[in-house]
Every structure is written in structure tokens, then in C-alpha cells.
Amino acid sequence: MKKVVKFGGSSLASAEQFKKVGDIIRSDESRRYVVPSAPGKRFDGDIKVTDMLYECYRAAEKGEKIAGKIKKIQARYQEIIDGLELDLKLDEQFAEIEKNFIAQAGSDYAASRGEFLNGIVMANYLG
């Protein structure tokens, strides 16, 4: 029987947490479909990636510059990627996300990008 497993934001908030999730997935061959959330809070006072993406969406909607906000999100993912020792760059994906926010992509788009990006990281980590 094949299983679908969903991991929440706090369980994918850092490279250390990613490794634990990887161990869980690898421990049961029937866990074939993985649904990752966007990275959540790493510690009290931290900001969830989804909230950071919503902030970009709202700023872009007002015509404000969002490059700095995008870079903060990208740095968060890069920290995870580096901690997992992956040879992975998300530059193209972040450029596309920034372009789409500026073109007034909706709030649903903002909500989905964290999961989208974490899916890429997870797929590369699991091989």
C-alpha cells in the first residue's frame, strides 16, 4: 500500500528538521507521496515563510519594491540547502516569483510558493 505523508512547517523549518523528516520518509518504503509545507518558525519570534511571502504580495500590490524581502526568503531557503549540503540553486525560481508578484499575482500564488519551493528542496534531498 502506498502512503501519502504531509509534513507541517515546523517540521521543515531548518536543515536539522529536514533531516528528521528524511529519516521518517526513508524508514517506510510505502511512504511514496510527500506533501511538504513551507518552512515554519524556527524559534519564538521567527517569521513563517508563508507570512514573508504574504508580506511580499502586499508590498507589491502597493507598488513597493520587494527585492529585499525576496532576498530574505531566499536566504532562508539557502540556509536549509546549505545545511543539507545540496548542490541546488533556486535563483531562477525566486526571479520568477518576484516577477509574478510585481505583475500582481494573487494571494493564492503567494500562499503556494513556500510549498512549491520546499517541494523542490525535498525532492533534491530525497533524491
Model-inferred region functions:
Residues M1-G127:
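Nucleotide/pyrophosphate-binding catalytic subdomain
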